Amino acid sequence: MPSVGNMKLFSLSTDNPGPLPPAPAAQSIASAVNNVAVSDDSNPGAGDFDGSGNSYSAGALAKYGITAGGKVTVEGAQLTFPSQSPGTANAVASQGQTLSVDDSGHKITLLTASNDGDILGFLRVNYTDGTSEQFPIEVADWFSSNPAPGGSLVASTAWNQRPGNNSPHAVGLYGLTVDTGASNAKTIASITLPSDGRLKVFSAAVH
């Protein structure tokens, strides 16, 4: 039985959906970024993580050791934070993209968050032999700073608001690990994200 973090998945469906269609061509996270999720404190108006002009504070994230191009340890995996500068596109808003992943192993860890509510969806895992599997995921709203079941809180920081707003609040950044099974001998080539733009992905790694 696959698991997400420590959450066991028992009865979402008893139906066999059959084989999935071929996965779309994969791209790197660096080439897929399309959301300005992190802004510099000197120019908060450049960010828009949530569609309302709010974003993560680069200065606040740096206090957790999270910086552009830096390494972040998340649930036992070494992830690389996007190298793009604050105030430029530096996260992937999920639109069904297929993202390449490096390294080997049977677990995939994401650095992620959502806006306007928690996300329930499926992460498609694509293997080098051409087959794929789907695994249910749940990602919490950044506004809560409270990870979804099976996830972890990586950082909870003050946000940057659009100019003219003055409502200080802490927002969360989360880790989420999908385990394809220790007995899985297949090699993971890529992942395909759900088609829900509220979900943002900063990094992903296989381990």
Give the ranges of each region predicted by the language model.
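N-terminal/edge-of-domain interface segments
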Residues: M1-H207
